[in-house]
Amino acid sequence: MKYHSSNLFAGEVEAMGSARASKSLPLQVAAVCFRRRGPAVEFLLVNTNGGNKWTFPKGSTDARLSHSQAAEREAAEEAGAYGSIEPRHFHLYLHSKGVFWQPEGVQEFVVKAFLMEIHDLRGREEPMRNPTWFSPEDAKKKLAKGREVKYARETEAVIDRALERIHFHSELWGQYPEHRHSRTLSR
Protein backbone atom coordinates (compact mmCIF):
# COMPACT_ATOMS: atom_id res chain seq x y z
CA MET A 1 0.00 0.00 0.00
CA LYS A 2 1.56 3.35 -1.02
CA TYR A 3 0.68 6.64 0.63
CA HIS A 4 1.28 9.87 -1.28
CA SER A 5 -0.13 12.25 1.27
CA SER A 6 1.09 13.34 4.67
CA ASN A 7 -2.27 12.24 6.09
CA LEU A 8 -3.60 8.71 6.37
CA PHE A 9 -7.31 8.13 6.23
CA ALA A 10 -9.47 6.10 8.59
CA GLY A 11 -9.76 3.13 6.25
CA GLU A 12 -5.99 2.89 5.89
CA VAL A 13 -5.48 3.05 9.65
CA GLU A 14 -8.19 0.44 10.21
CA ALA A 15 -6.36 -1.78 7.71
CA MET A 16 -3.41 -1.54 10.13
CA GLY A 17 -5.53 -3.22 12.77
CA SER A 18 -6.80 -0.22 14.72
CA ALA A 19 -10.38 0.98 14.75
CA ARG A 20 -9.56 4.07 16.84
CA ALA A 21 -9.32 6.46 13.92
CA SER A 22 -12.42 7.96 12.41
CA LYS A 23 -10.70 10.90 10.76
CA SER A 24 -7.57 11.70 8.85
CA LEU A 25 -4.45 11.58 11.01
CA PRO A 26 -1.19 13.46 10.45
CA LEU A 27 1.81 11.39 9.46
CA GLN A 28 5.21 11.18 11.15
CA VAL A 29 8.23 9.07 10.26
CA ALA A 30 10.50 7.19 12.67
CA ALA A 31 13.97 5.73 12.28
CA VAL A 32 14.10 2.45 14.20
CA CYS A 33 17.86 2.50 14.69
CA PHE A 34 19.75 -0.68 15.54
CA ARG A 35 23.24 -2.12 15.70
CA ARG A 36 24.63 -5.62 15.98
CA ARG A 37 26.90 -6.69 18.82
CA GLY A 38 27.92 -10.20 17.78
CA PRO A 39 24.69 -12.20 17.83
CA ALA A 40 22.92 -9.51 19.91
CA VAL A 41 20.92 -6.58 18.55
CA GLU A 42 20.55 -3.22 20.31
CA PHE A 43 18.13 -0.37 19.59
CA LEU A 44 18.95 3.33 19.82
CA LEU A 45 16.36 5.43 21.64
CA VAL A 46 16.29 9.15 22.40
CA ASN A 47 14.67 11.18 25.17
CA THR A 48 11.47 12.98 24.27
CA ASN A 49 11.51 16.77 24.22
CA GLY A 50 10.31 16.73 27.84
CA GLY A 51 13.21 14.44 28.70
CA ASN A 52 11.40 11.92 30.92
CA LYS A 53 10.33 9.38 28.29
CA TRP A 54 12.10 7.45 25.52
CA THR A 55 11.18 7.19 21.85
CA PHE A 56 12.55 6.37 18.42
CA PRO A 57 14.00 9.35 16.52
CA LYS A 58 10.92 10.64 14.71
CA GLY A 59 9.35 13.72 13.26
CA SER A 60 7.41 15.28 10.44
CA THR A 61 7.62 14.52 6.77
CA ASP A 62 9.10 16.98 4.29
CA ALA A 63 7.74 17.45 0.77
CA ARG A 64 11.33 17.69 -0.55
CA LEU A 65 12.33 14.30 0.90
CA SER A 66 11.08 10.74 0.59
CA HIS A 67 9.65 9.37 3.82
CA SER A 68 12.76 7.23 4.39
CA GLN A 69 14.99 10.27 3.84
CA ALA A 70 12.92 12.23 6.37
CA ALA A 71 13.32 9.40 8.91
CA GLU A 72 17.06 9.32 8.19
CA ARG A 73 17.20 13.10 8.80
CA GLU A 74 15.48 12.62 12.18
CA ALA A 75 18.06 9.99 13.20
CA ALA A 76 20.87 12.42 12.34
CA GLU A 77 19.29 15.45 14.03
CA GLU A 78 18.06 13.77 17.22
CA ALA A 79 20.68 11.06 17.75
CA GLY A 80 23.65 11.92 15.52
CA ALA A 81 23.09 8.47 13.98
CA TYR A 82 24.17 7.59 10.43
CA GLY A 83 23.84 4.33 8.55
CA SER A 84 21.79 2.32 6.07
CA ILE A 85 18.03 2.85 6.04
CA GLU A 86 15.40 0.75 4.31
CA PRO A 87 13.71 2.65 1.49
CA ARG A 88 10.25 1.37 2.54
CA HIS A 89 8.61 1.40 5.94
CA PHE A 90 8.24 -1.96 7.67
CA HIS A 91 5.53 -1.04 10.17
CA LEU A 92 2.88 1.55 10.97
CA TYR A 93 1.87 2.49 14.49
CA LEU A 94 -0.24 5.08 16.28
CA HIS A 95 1.34 7.65 18.58
CA SER A 96 -0.40 10.16 20.85
CA LYS A 97 1.28 13.41 21.83
CA GLY A 98 0.17 15.82 24.52
CA VAL A 99 -2.18 15.55 27.48
CA PHE A 100 -5.92 16.07 27.62
CA TRP A 101 -5.78 18.78 30.30
CA GLN A 102 -3.58 21.08 28.20
CA PRO A 103 -5.22 23.57 25.80
CA GLU A 104 -3.76 21.75 22.78
CA GLY A 105 -5.14 18.45 24.04
CA VAL A 106 -3.99 15.12 22.65
CA GLN A 107 -2.89 14.81 19.04
CA GLU A 108 -2.73 11.38 17.40
CA PHE A 109 -0.29 10.56 14.62
CA VAL A 110 0.25 7.61 12.34
CA VAL A 111 3.97 6.82 12.33
CA LYS A 112 5.76 5.06 9.48
CA ALA A 113 8.67 3.09 10.95
CA PHE A 114 11.83 2.63 8.87
CA LEU A 115 14.57 0.20 9.88
CA MET A 116 18.04 1.77 9.98
CA GLU A 117 21.30 -0.01 10.77
CA ILE A 118 23.65 2.46 12.43
CA HIS A 119 27.30 2.55 11.36
CA ASP A 120 28.38 5.84 12.95
CA LEU A 121 27.38 8.19 15.77
CA ARG A 122 28.60 11.79 15.68
CA GLY A 123 27.47 15.29 16.63
CA ARG A 124 23.73 15.87 16.80
CA GLU A 125 21.62 19.01 16.54
CA GLU A 126 19.52 18.20 19.62
CA PRO A 127 21.94 17.53 22.52
CA MET A 128 19.17 17.06 25.14
CA ARG A 129 18.02 13.83 23.43
CA ASN A 130 20.67 11.62 25.12
CA PRO A 131 20.76 8.79 22.54
CA THR A 132 21.26 5.47 24.32
CA TRP A 133 21.54 1.84 23.19
CA PHE A 134 19.20 -0.77 24.73
CA SER A 135 18.65 -4.49 24.36
CA PRO A 136 15.28 -5.33 22.73
CA GLU A 137 13.67 -6.14 26.10
CA ASP A 138 15.04 -3.01 27.76
CA ALA A 139 13.96 -0.90 24.76
CA LYS A 140 10.40 -2.24 25.11
CA LYS A 141 10.43 -1.33 28.83
CA LYS A 142 11.84 2.16 28.21
CA LEU A 143 9.33 2.86 25.43
CA ALA A 144 6.44 1.71 27.67
CA LYS A 145 7.45 3.54 30.85
CA GLY A 146 5.01 6.33 31.71
CA ARG A 147 2.88 5.64 28.62
CA GLU A 148 -0.60 4.31 27.99
CA VAL A 149 -0.89 0.55 27.58
CA LYS A 150 -1.99 0.89 23.93
CA TYR A 151 1.18 2.84 23.08
CA ALA A 152 3.33 0.27 24.88
CA ARG A 153 1.74 -2.45 22.75
CA GLU A 154 2.28 -0.43 19.57
CA THR A 155 6.00 0.08 20.24
CA GLU A 156 6.47 -3.50 21.43
CA ALA A 157 5.13 -4.61 18.04
CA VAL A 158 7.61 -2.26 16.32
CA ILE A 159 10.54 -3.88 18.16
CA ASP A 160 9.23 -7.39 17.44
CA ARG A 161 8.75 -6.67 13.72
CA ALA A 162 12.18 -5.04 13.53
CA LEU A 163 13.79 -8.11 15.10
CA GLU A 164 12.01 -10.38 12.59
CA ARG A 165 13.39 -8.33 9.68
CA ILE A 166 16.88 -8.10 11.16
CA HIS A 167 17.03 -11.86 11.74
CA PHE A 168 15.66 -12.55 8.25
CA HIS A 169 18.36 -10.37 6.70
CA SER A 170 21.06 -11.83 8.96
CA GLU A 171 20.22 -15.30 7.68
CA LEU A 172 20.20 -14.05 4.09
CA TRP A 173 23.47 -12.09 4.46
CA GLY A 174 25.10 -15.05 6.16
CA GLN A 175 24.75 -16.85 2.83
CA TYR A 176 26.29 -13.92 0.94
CA PRO A 177 28.88 -12.29 3.27
CA GLU A 178 30.46 -10.28 0.46
CA HIS A 179 27.27 -8.14 0.31
CA ARG A 180 27.09 -7.51 4.05
CA HIS A 181 28.51 -3.96 4.01
CA SER A 182 27.31 -2.78 0.61
CA ARG A 183 23.57 -2.88 1.00
CA THR A 184 20.49 -1.13 2.16
CA LEU A 185 17.97 -3.27 3.93
CA SER A 186 15.09 -4.27 1.70
CA ARG A 187 12.78 -7.18 1.24
Describe each region flagged by the PLM.
Residues 39-82:
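Conserved Nudix-box catalytic region and its N-terminal flanking loop in Nudix hydrolases
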Residues 2-38:
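Acidic, metal-coordinating catalytic segment for phosphate/diphosphate chemistry
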Residues 36-42, 104-106:
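Short, solvent-exposed loop/turn segments that connect beta-strands within catalytic domains
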Residues 32, 45, 113-115, 133:
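Conserved hydrophobic/aromatic beta-strand scaffold that supports enzyme active sites
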Residues 76, 80-122:
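Active-site segment of metal-dependent pyrophosphate-handling enzymes
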Residues 52-53, 123-187:
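Nudix hydrolase/Nudix homology domain
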